Swiss-Prot record:
Organism lineage: Eukaryota, Metazoa, Spiralia, Lophotrochozoa, Mollusca
Family assignment from sequence similarity: Belongs to the conotoxin A superfamily.
Record's subcellular location: Secreted
Keyword Disulfide bond: yes
Record function comment: Alpha-conotoxins act on postsynaptic membranes, they bind to the nicotinic acetylcholine receptors (nAChR) and thus inhibit them. This toxin blocks rat neuronal nAChR alpha-3-beta-2/CHRNA3-CHRNB2 (IC(50)=128.9 nM) and alpha-7/CHRNA7 (IC(50)=1511 nM). In vivo, intramuscular injection into zebrafish does not produce any effect on the locomotion of zebrafish.
Annotated organism of origin: Conus catus (Cat cone)
Protein name: Alpha-conotoxin CIB
A GO term from the CC aspect: host cell postsynaptic membrane
Residue positions assigned to the propeptide: 1-21
Expression (tissue specificity): Expressed by the venom duct.
Further remark: Negative results: this toxin does not show effect on neuronal nAChR alpha-4-beta-2/CHRNA4-CHRNB2 and on muscular alpha-1-beta-1-gamma-delta (CHRNA1-CHRNB1-CHRNG-CHRND) (when tested at 10 uM).
Ser-Xaa-Pro motif, crucial for potent interaction with nAChR: annotated segments: 25-27
Domain comment, as recorded: The cysteine framework is I (CC-C-C). Alpha4/7 pattern.
Entry keyword annotation includes Phosphoprotein: no
Length: 41
């Protein structure tokens, strides 16, 4: 393992996290992905 795949996975996770942050501010998307948004009330 040369570490390249790990870096790519970290990068993908960051992109997904950013997308989910946007999703969490969208009520429809938030309802579809409550786990990703942490169900804060």
């Amino acid at each position: 393992s040369d570490g390249r795949n790990e870096a790519a996975n970290d990068e993908a996770s960051d992109v997904i996290e950013l997308a989910l942050k946007g999703c969490c501010s969208n009520p429809v998307c938030h309802l579809e992905h409550p786990n990703a948004c942490g169900r804060r009330r």
